[in-house]
């Protein structure tokens, strides 16, 4: 059955949003919501948050506080441009956006939508979780509450957001210059991740890694930190033995399941390959694909 067209409201002043959201639903890029609508999800009145993007920059850096503020309502393209134009450095998020869907989707999709959809496979979430993000949420009375991203993610498609609340921005402690993101999907573009990994660390002058933070998607009910593997790496030189130990430690951090995209077995092998690849560049010999055989037979075994 074709859904009836919703009423679309497009505020440009953030102060108007809470009032308009009473009994309505937020929409940003619409790249998840419109798919849900086709599947029959109801949304009688939509409040389009993208009109708010003109009121502020996509990314701001507060050097004194050592913090980056990233808009939840700008398209991902604007966020990536903000990060590469010198507004701040966040290599893992920049890499995640570059591997996200396709240019057309990146020109529409937002971080707010990616967070609120609550998918364990969401591609911006590992970088934000690894960086220790805090989510700024506007409450129905126009107040502000802040919640750690780790507590915001409650389960598959479930987040800590009440009716009438909306996400205005995400704040992270300024990430180190060394970080990255890699995903494995069924193809290079327009692919939901079978698995994804974000990492960040400082590399000390003697080569040891400190402040190691890793987060992985599609291996648990929510995106998760790889705390055990990170602890193995902390303050160590990433020698072959240390990398082997960190890769072996991943099993304690993840609980993948078989689903229509990939088997748990395949995901465990990909998880090992992705971490090895993150730790052993740029010799070029340690690509994740070399550690997995992405055949349909294996994915389903
Ligand atoms: C072809 C295609 C390819 C895709 N590829 C990827 C991919 O590679 N990686 C990936 O992670 N995802 C992918 N997706 C999923 C989707 O693009 C992302 O989840 C995207 O970030 C959603 O953002 P949006 O702004 O479009 O959200 P919308 O669709 O506008 O909204 C999604 C949900 O979030 C709510 N919402 C939106 N913004 C806010 C806010 N600021 N505050 C409160 N609630 C809000 C809406 O009410 C709705 O429930 C893909 C989707 C499509 C259609």
Predicted regions and their residues:
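C-terminal structural segment of proteins
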Residues: 1-301
